[in-house]
Curated annotation (Swiss-Prot):
Belongs to the nucleoporin Nup85 family. The gene is nup85. This is Nuclear pore complex protein Nup85. It is found in: Nucleus, Nuclear pore complex; Nucleus membrane. It holds the Pfam family Nucleopor_Nup85. It comes from the Eukaryota. PANTHER family: FROUNT PROTEIN-RELATED (PTHR13373), NUCLEAR PORE COMPLEX PROTEIN NUP85 (PTHR13373:SF21). Coiled coil: none annotated. It comes from Xenopus laevis (African clawed frog).
């Protein structure tokens, strides 16, 4: 897209920058962190107090609105449904489907507006905030509806005006309020705005309602009855095109010309000369621009003026002619008294069929990417953006969806919606998703499991490992060793699994028992991730065998753990001490050969300890508890060796 031709909006931050220091910043997903640095600006040698605050600036506050969150959630399901149905329909059925999708989006917008209306009436404190949001949503729905008519329905001459009339009736409702006030009064025909109601209905092409109101005037005034009858007849006879009708444009134009001549004849004959209100209505029917402009207060907007002008002057307007009438109607309506608003520029761009300008203008004025992302996606399905690629490889649809989804990832729950938007961005969506998944704050295990499932479904191996490592570290910091071990196994992180296994063994040495037995008992093939984890699993298996009095199997396993040297050096003595109850059993458990192995392991342990200990520390440790345990082991091993030799000798004889 082109460079912006407007200056970006400034956001003043109270208190920031008052100390004449340089400002530091750090970007986050949807946020900007600002703070004052220690560095003073040039030319300022005065010392000033440091600002004790940091400021978090959010680029999109809308995602924190409870009502707008409903908009994001419901439009997400519409978006996903549209993507899934992209290949299912074609031709006329596809067009009807796209029109229905567009109406679904608009119905969600209108539901949000209605809810905000209710909230603004019930809460005074935040009423202004809701009114502002209603104004933005109203502009979105107005613009979307026009784009639906011009780009999706692609209505030809004739049906085009019918759709534009429906558009105006839906979005300009002042005449309904006027008529309600009139009908509530005791004498409606004497109400000061009675004729405003009649004229307002006529300006919107609502001839039946205008005739019903006019009938009240005819019933109360005998002098005006004949004029009312003539005006009613003109309103009744006004030719109107209908969607799906069989009437050709040529036939319609012929009828419309005859009807117009009849209106002009009554005006020239002075049929309504005694009633200025009826005469004004007749002039409106003839499309008198001067009278139409006099009624601008009833229309309130230039686009209502445009549609009314077309209704009475050029009802068979072609789509290619709209931009001329739109620009001239805007100029006539404003009459140089004011400048066009941003919404006016958006609507003008739509009437010029410049969809890129519509997207650009709304991107400038909107506080979020919801409107432009979803509208662009819908129009892309209408194949209106095929040739508009951006320089970095993504088309405009993908660019806007990526930005919208990135904004969703800054919210603690809406980030899950953003995943699907990335999924339907074929060029860069996967890479964006990888980056965002690595930066999600994993505040709870439930959230981590959701993130993990998303990454596993998309075979994002590195992100799976990153999430598991993060959760393993969090669990370790919270002293939840079982959870930490489980996460490290899922991450297939051998080093971290070794670290946690060491923590389990250390805890066992301190307490004399294991925590999280269910996890350790069911490690299965996961224990092969690291030697230390294998040792932990097998060591727990030794304890289980011992508790089940499978002494021979327990002894063999214990000996294999010692000879395999996969236990940490600090744990060797604990292993040897675990052999003591087996050595003291009435039945000989360890054979002579196994006892020699145990003795060798004990001496190796003592030798390793001597190598790593200074002479002064050796003297201090001579009377330590460890020394006593070693002597007990040596004595038990010697006794067991003697018993084993005797037993084995007796068996040989």
């Amino acid at each position: 897209m082109e460079e912006l031709d407007v200056d970006p909006a400034e956001t003043p931050i109270p208190g920031l920058g008052q100390q004449n220091r340089h400002i530091g910043f750090s970007w986050g997903p949807g946020d900007l962190l600002l703070y004052e640095t220690l560095y003073q600006k040039q030319g300022n040698s005065e010392t000033a107090a440091r600002c004790p605050f940091m400021y978090l600036v959010r680029s999109d506050e809308d995602i924190y609105s409870p009502v707008l969150r409903k908009l994001f959630n419901e439009s997400h399901s519409i978006f996903v449904g549209l993507q899934k149905s992209a290949e299912e329909a074609s031709g006329k059925s596809r067009k009807a489907q796209l029109v229905q999708v567009s109406r679904n989006y608009r119905s969600v917008l209108r539901a949000c507006m209605e809810e905000m209306h209710t909230l603004s009436e019930s809460t005074r404190e935040t009423a202004q905030k809701y009114i502002s949001q209603i104004s933005i949503l109203s502009a979105m729905e107005l613009s979307w509806n026009l784009c639906e008519i011009l780009f999706i329905e692609s209505a030809p001459a004739g049906p085009l005006l019918i759709l534009l009339l429906e558009w105006v009736r839906l979005h300009v409702c002042e005449v309904d309020n006027i008529v309600q006030d009139v009908l509530r009064s005791e004498k409606p025909t004497e109400h000061e705005k009675f004729w405003d109601g009649v004229t307002g209905y006529v300006l919107q092409g609502r001839m039946n309602e205008a005739r019903q109101l006019l009938a009240k005037e005819a019933s109360t005034s005998a002098s005006a009855r004949s004029m009312c009858r003539v005006l009613d007849d003109l309103l009744k006879k006004m030719p109107m095109l209908h969607t799906g009708g069989t009437q050709t444009l040529t036939e319609f134009e012929l009828k419309w010309q005859h009807w117009r001549e009849e209106c002009e004849r009554h005006l020239q004959n002075g049929t309504f000369s005694s009633n200025v209100h009826m005469e004004a209505v007749c002039r409106v029917l003839l499309g008198d621009e001067e009278v139409l402009l006099e009624k601008r207060d009833l229309m309130t907007t230039w686009y209502h003026f445009l549609v009314s002008r077309l209704l009475f002057k050029h009802p068979t307007v072609k789509p290619t002619e709209l931009h001329f009438y739109a620009q001239s109607s805007l100029d006539m309506f404003l009459a140089g008294d004011s400048c066009p608003e941003p919404l006016d520029n958006i609507l003008l761009a739509a009437f010029e069929f410049d969809i890129h300008q519509v997207i650009k203008e709304f991107s400038i004025v909107s506080s979020n990417w919801w409107f432009v992302a979803h509208l662009t996606d819908l129009l892309d399905h209408c194949q209106l953006f095929q040739a508009h690629n951006l320089y970095f490889g993504a088309n405009m649809r993908e660019f806007l969806l990526l930005d919208y989804a990135s904004g969703l990832f800054s919210h603690h729950s809406l980030w899950q919606l953003g995943v699907d938007y990335f999924d339907y961005c074929p060029n860069l969506g996967r890479e964006y998703l990888k980056l965002h998944m690595e930066r999600i704050p994993l505040s709870t295990e439930k959230k981590a499991l959701k993130a993990l499932r998303i990454c596993e479904q998309r075979q994002m191996t590195e992100q799976v490992r990153s999430i598991c490592k993060t959760m393993a570290m969090q669990s370790l910091c919270n002293r939840r060793l079982g959870s930490a071990l489980s996460w490290s196994i899922r991450a297939k992180d051998a080093a971290f699994a070794t670290l946690i296994s060491d923590r389990f063994l250390k805890e066992y040495c301190e307490r004399g028992n294991f925590t999280d037995l269910d996890l350790i008992d069911n490690l299965g093939s996961a224990m092969l991730l690291s030697d230390r984890l294998t040792f932990l699993g097998k060591y727990r298996e030794f304890h289980r065998m011992y508790s089940q009095e499978q002494f021979s199997e327990a002894a063999s396993l214990l000996l294999s753990l010692m000879t395999a040297r996969i236990a940490p050096c600090s744990f060797w003595l604990t292993l040897l001490l675990d052999a003591l109850p087996l050595l003291e059993q009435k039945q000989v458990i360890f054979s002579a050969e196994q006892t020699y192995e145990l003795m060798r392991c004990l001496e190796d342990r003592m030798a390793a300890k001597l190598e790593s200990t200074s002479p002064d520390e050796i003297q201090k440790q001579d009377s330590s508890i460890d020394n006593t345990k070693v002597e007990m082991l040596r004595l038990a091993l010697a006794r067991n060796l003697a018993r084993a030799i005797v037993t084995e000798g007796a068996l040989q004889e």
